[in-house]
Curated annotation (Swiss-Prot):
Protein name (record): Small ribosomal subunit protein bS16
Pro residues composition bias: residue spans: 87-97
Region Disordered, annotated ranges: 81-174
NCBIfam families in alphabetical order: PRK14520.1, S16
Keyword Cytoplasm: no
Length: 174
């Protein structure tokens, strides 16, 4: 029976994730596997490659043939060089350790405690129908006009009409 070490595709569309498996050469790409011996995630930075070196060495020793992509992965991990007797490759890149969430939270809390609190940078939204600022402005303008109209009877009629127009213009239209 011809045995191959190859990749089976898992994951979602545009988010591939592969398993390194040992399978019969006649099975489908994602068909039944004899054994899963590793994982490969190309979307992470740096790419995640996990291989069970003991099982890879066993399957290569009994004659399993790796496909080209798997052979490249085994060269990166150094398993292919161990099998063929070649010198070891340079070490793989490793992901930087993630910062401790508790330490980040404490640092942010200390930073926030030292800063003086200020007003919000954006103003509050006004309510849609009743704009208080618009209602008070015409009324404030009407009061001085009414006082002036009491002093001048001839010009008072026109200013009172203007003040009434100003209040009717300021009312919100439904």
């Amino acid at each position: 029976m011809a045995v191959k070490i190859r990749l089976t595709r898992m994951g979602k569309i545009r988010a591939p994730y592969y398993r390194i498996v040992v399978a019969d050469a006649r099975t489908k790409r994602d068909g039944r596997a004899i054994e899963e011996i590793g994982q490969y995630d190309p979307k992470q930075e740096p790419s995640l490659i996990r291989v069970n070196s003991e099982r890879v060495a066993y399957w290569l020793s009994v004659g399993a043939q790796p496909t080209e992509p798997v052979k490249a992965l085994l060269k990166v991990t150094g398993d292919w060089q161990r099998f063929t007797g070649e010198p070891a490759p340079p070490p793989m890149k490793t992901a930087p350790p993630k910062p401790d969430k508790k330490a980040l939270f404490e640092a942010a809390a200390k930073e926030a405690a030292g800063e003086p609190r200020a007003e919000a940078t954006t103003s509050r939204k006004r309510s849609g129908k009743h704009d208080k600022g618009a209602e008070t402005t015409p009324a404030a303008e009407a009061a001085p006009d009414a006082a002036a109209s009491a002093d001048e009877p001839a010009g008072g009629a026109s200013t009172a009409a203007e003040s009434q127009d100003a209040t009717t213009d300021a009312t919100p239209s439904a």
